[in-house]
Curated annotation (Swiss-Prot):
Modification after translation: Proteolytically cleaved into 2 subunits, an extracellular subunit and a seven-transmembrane subunit.
Record has Cell membrane as a keyword: yes
Transmembrane segments: 766-786, 800-820, 827-847, 874-894, 912-932, 967-987, 995-1015
UniProt protein name: Latrophilin Cirl
Extracellular side: 1-765, 821-826, 895-911, 988-994
Low complexity: bias regions: 186-198, 272-282, 290-301, 1296-1315, 1330-1348, 1453-1478, 1565-1580, 1660-1675
Disulfide bonds listed in the record: 707-734, 722-736
Compartmental location: Cell membrane
Amino acid sequence: MSSIDISGRYALNDLEMVSKYQTAYACEGKKLTIECDPGDVINLIRANYGRFSITICNDHGNVEWSVNCMFPKSLTVLNSRCAHKQSCSVLAATSMFGDPCPGTHKYLEAHYQCISAAQTSTTTNRPSPPPWVLNNGPPIFGNGSGLIHPPGSPGAAPPPPRLPTLPGVVGISGNGGLFNVPPPHTVTHSTPSSSTVPGRMKGVATSTTTTKNPAGRHDGLPPPPQLHHHHTHHGEEAAPPTKPSSKLPSAGNATAPSNTRILTGVGGSGTDDGTLLTTKSSPNRPPVTASNGSPASGNNSVVRTINNINMNAAGMSGADDESKLFCGPTHARNLFWNMTRVGDVNVQPCPGGAAGIAKWRCVLMKRLPDSGYDEYDDDPSSTTPAPSGGDCLHNSSSCDPPVSMAHKVNQRLRNFEPTWHPMTPDLTQCRSLWLNNLELRVNQRDSSLISIANDMSEVTSSKTLYGGDMLVTTKIIQTVSEKMLHDKETFPDQRQREAMIMELLHCVVKTGSNLLDESQLSSWLDLNPEDQMRVATSLLTGLEYNAFLLADTIIRERSVVQKVKNILLSVRVLETKTIPPSVIFPDSDQWPLSSDRIELPRAALLDNSEGGLVRIVFAAFDRLESILKPSYDHFDLKSSRSYVRNTAILANDSSDSNTGEIQQRIRILNSKVISASLGKGRHIQLSQPITLTLKHLKTENVTNPTCVFWNYIDHAWSANGCSLESTNRTHSVCSCNHLTNFAILMDVVDEHQHSLFTMFDGNMRVFIYISIAICVVFIVIALLTLKLFNGVFVKSARTTIYTSIYVCLLAIELLFLLGIEQTETSIFCGFITVFLHCAILSGAAWFCYEAFHSYYTLTSDELLVEVDQTPKVNWYYLLSYGLSVSVVAISVAINPSTYTQNDYCVLMEANILFYATFVAPVLIFFVAAIGYTFLSWIIMCRKSCTGLKTKEHTRLASVRFDIRCSFVFLLLLSAVWCSAYFYLRGAKTDEDTTTIYGYCFICFNTLLGLYIFVFHCIQNEKIRREYRKYVRQHAWLPKCLRCSKTSISSGIVAGGGPAAGTLCSVNTSKKPKLPLGVSEEVHGEQQQHQQAMGVPAPEDAIMGATSDCELNEAQQRRTLKSGLMTGTLQTPQQPLAGHVVLERGSTLRSTGHASPTSSAGSTHLIFAHKQQQQQQALGESYYHQPDYYSWKQPPQGGLKSQREYYNNAGVAASSPQQAHEVFYWTQKPNSQHGKKKRGGAVPASPSGSLHSRTAAASQVLFYPSYKKTKQGQPSGYPHYAEALDPPHSAGAAFYQQQQQMRRQQQQQQQQQQQQLSSDEEQAEQHAHLLHLQHQQQHQRRVGGQQQLPAPPPHMAHFQQEFMQRQFRNKTSNCDLAMGGDTYHNQGSEGGADVCPVYEEILSNRNSDVQHYEVGDFDVDEVYNNSVGTGVFNSMRAAITAGGSRYGGGSLSGGSVSSRSQQQQLQKQQKQQQQQQQRSARRCTADDDDDDDEEEDDEATAAEQLHDSVCDDDDEEEDSDLDDDAHKLPPQSDERMRRLMAMQDEDFKRRFQRQQRKNGASIDYGALPPGVAPGAGSAGPHPDHNRAVFGVSGGVGEGSMRGAYRQQQQQQQQQLNAKSPSARLAVNELFGHGNAGPPLPPANQTPAQKRQQLQKLSPQSTTSSSSHTSHSNLQPHPHPLTHQHPHPPQHQQRHLSAMLDENNTVRCYLEPLAK
């Protein structure tokens, strides 16, 4: 029967007339001429100018030329000259094509066809006839699967004549199937002819033809994979236009793809057993219905074939399927492989330097179906079964039409694609010229074996070898050993004989090592698997023969070791009498590449001794395991994928026909090969077995170790005589009863050996990165919050616990992110797993301790206060980190491989150690944490049912919230870790739930980060407040964000009640804080009156520590306007003069130094007002500046006398201020649990908050400290009378005129903010005015009248300096007018300019002096009790006796006129001292009781000051009686006065006794503290008289003791220096004159400040007392000695306020420059 072509282009009987493509060559420098017959034109297929063969155009046999030389545009150049022409000539020169490889002689090669000029389309590129022809092979079974009988086997049909067809196409349907054709009786046998191009070189084949596979070629099994390919994809333009690019295998897919399955077909003749059909997954393939054919009986097989059929009857056009019948061009092994038709073998000469031919076969690769359908079923649209038998080919009426047949064939071909097989070309017949030469030499009789061996080792190490060279080399090795066995007898000398054989052995070992080297791996891949096994066996036996050649030569005990790169060979000759109990090979220092070991027992050696000697040959090989691969046991799809990567070998499973259900089992060689021999190639049986310890090369995803040896006869591994004794993850111990080459075979479970991220899809990988990044960012924010705002919290155990938890979580996240990127071969893998294990254990431990701490807090006294618990925290540190490190260390010591050999680098191996050291501790910690949480919850429920105090309820609510947060935190963290664990475990087995666990981990991990930020940062009110402060004080944010737009009094202005405008409305029903000196009853009445009169109710607001919000003119400030009259509050359009409202969350700005003890910056309380004029309309009431001199406290604390200021006619210009802003500090209780004793230890930085409230003036009693008085002359200064009695002063006109002038000048200068420079003048002026007013009213009451004091003398020196300040654009706060020294509060009257007031808000509880109005109590009693009774009486006596003045200001304002008055004062002093002593004793007892009391967080400043002396209720009643009798200030101040008086009196007595001992006769008690002993009689110099007034002493220093001790030390030091331990006096702090320069203007830039400081001379500095050592005060030279006046130095210092250790806001100066 005639054969029909599938393409339809050729007639049935025209197979021999098909146009053939021809090849033409032209050497470089010559012309290539192509000619076709008349009527035909040239159709170029491909061309190249370069060199692909070493034999073409190489007359001299040069082997150094490049054979990988190609000019890519060769075809384009030839097409421009020859396309569609009958003949053409092209010069083969670099001028035409370029020079792709300089130095190599090139040639031009062209493949073309001569086609008819009438043809309009390109014909096929190959001359071979169509492959789809009838096949007379045996029919297949009905289900498409059948038993394949190799040719010649029983049951197989006689092989038909060789056909140029595609044999072994896979069968389709069952009985009566479409292609089930009976074997024909006759077959047309056509063979493609070859023609030689005229002028072609002799011996070169004209075209690629289909040839018979050489004998011994085994294509049934794939060869080992190629680790690195030399393939490059070229010549894509030579592909047919209809061929998709995906069908052209490139360098990577020149062989079967990694997920292919190779199936062996049948057909053909001779040794060629057909084309290999491979399967490949095609996810886009449309589903096909299952076959209706019933399975036939017979043996099933995974190998299925298609009968060779005649496709021409189908009438199918080959245009669509032509591309599926060719393998694309590619480069491999220095050869260019042209496009080859499926089923053909491409044959060409070997690469340069080698002789022989190279072959490569093109086969079809079939895609694997996606589901369980039969991949060979018909199209779903075709449901009619084809008739059975051969009727389809002869009776067209009973068959499908030809179009249907072509459609069905297309459906079949769509599942195939061509590919090259095997993975690399077959170069078994290629032999290098050098090795051929060596083979000729070794066979010569007089050849030098040593020279040949040396040359062979050199060639194999430096030259490129091919598959045939491996065969030649191993053959030479065996030949050399055989010849040396005969030649050694010619050496009579034993030593010479041993030396010759040893040198030969060294060359042979080196040659074998070269063959095993990685550089020669491609040479092994040139061989088919059978040849590889044969060469490996020959190499092992050749090495063994040469080794025993040396061993037999040695006649005494000796050991010879030959060590090269890949082979360690040891020859040992042992005497039987000296054989140890066991012989071990190799030594640890001999072979560091592996820890394998062979141990031979002594009895087994004695049985194989000869002549009293035992000769043993040991060998250890590297890289031989990649050559000696095991045979196949099972096969499946996953195995094939693993095979390509890991050199595993696949085989067919005849027990199952369903390939998808075949069990996976791949056997790999998993150890190095080690050898021991007692005879030449003999498997000697031993009386006692030997012991082998072999290390596993791969420890993951392997199982079932088997001890095997290499069988020389079968060229395969065998387990006979060997058994497995024991095994672990890294080693196996075997026992064998014979000797040969040993190794370990293991089954591969899964061959995924890569990082965790390689199995993630794209979305999951991105999500994991995002999730971990979010969690890490929020954890870092939480850590920074605890670090930056640590002053907000008490240093408690809970804060430390959460800090440690965050650190552990941060380490876990980073280690996890780093670990999933590593592979198990990475050096960091083990370290990451170890540290991750430790971090997880530590984090779980800290969670347990957090729950325990909550339980401990509820069951102890710590419920009321959160204090520092350093000892307990230290135990937590020890238990958490100590236990974690100990557990990990024990785990590492027991089995280090648990960390180093794992699925991924973030998880330990799932063994007993993993569950004992990881799972168990984590579960214990978590269960304990949950248990303590439930216990804590039960206790809270019980406590909530019992009656508790308000503070306990508050604290209990806080603990309840913490427990809830920590419990949710624990559950969320458990979800994160569990999802990560199940995800990693599921990823190993590719479970369906793995993706679910992965996305659960992503979600839970993201929620964990958000939860940490929200509930541990944002939810905390203190942290929120600190966030606002932090944002406002940093310039990198816009000012609109840094400056709050809500005033502190915004809640009052809006009239929204107590919670309106406040920062936190959690507790809006708290009891309002009382101002200083106001009782609760009076406060309640005042509140009602304020609500009726429109006065704002007291409102508390927490102020921030610092702020950059400057009080400039452009900023609008809220004020009270016309609300006090009508009861309504409104916001004015313009701010009023002198009114500064502090913005909520900020503080008053100062340019002082930052406080070193403040938690979040300096608490600046010193402030300045704007100099801004505001017209006052009728009926308006507004805030004045804090005006202390014109404000009156009602005598009885009520409101009757205060109501006279409220009238319907409006508020007069001189009306006092009706509301004030009060600032006070509340501190969290600390660990002292009581009041700080004087001279006690300095505690840590106090933590609390500064509060601001607005209250009516009648409710506020101010405590200005750091005041000093001046004595002036009223005759020279008429404005003093005006200051004392402003409405009736005779100098009012002069004063108003001066003030108007100053206002105009200040408005012209446009001053933006009042300065902080000259606080001393303001302080002097303020205190002096108060004292003058006291003295005036007292004299009026007793009937006496005295002259007003004159201004201090030192002020006269600086009058011009004060005036000059106006021209520096820096207005001093208390500059004097031109007409005289103005000592008054300039903001006291409505028409006056605004002047800032510098005020310390809280009074020092130790010894600060307070000032009160004269109307409240007698002035003499004030001065007798303010600082010290005896002190001021002594001062007055000194004034009377000597007429001296105190530093420019009199303390009393006048002298005592009579001795009776002095005696009366002394009598009152003694009575007062007795009362003070009794009170002090009671206070001392009360202080002891107060140590156990807790201070409320919201205690007011008045309450704190009250508690600082004593808190006993009985003592308060007694003190109130005294206050009522003598009209004294409130009781808390009285107690302070008594304590100060006792201390000063005691110091005075001790000081006087010391003076008497020294022989002094003067009563120093009558001298002022500023006068030195001995100077009173003569009268001190005016410059020496300085008053010490209202300065607290240091440790052991009272307000007067400091001055006396200072004077004593100055006398001893010749009045040149002061004691550094003495506290500075007020006049030193604020004084002018010779004592030091005046204070500077405040708001300067740092540059201006530095420039002025550089001009100063060095000044001595002294730190303050020990309890205020964090603040620097500026001392001045003491004024006791006479100093000449000198011009003032304009040094500028800044005044700051800060909180000291006594919880007092102190005002301090900037230190002078040294």
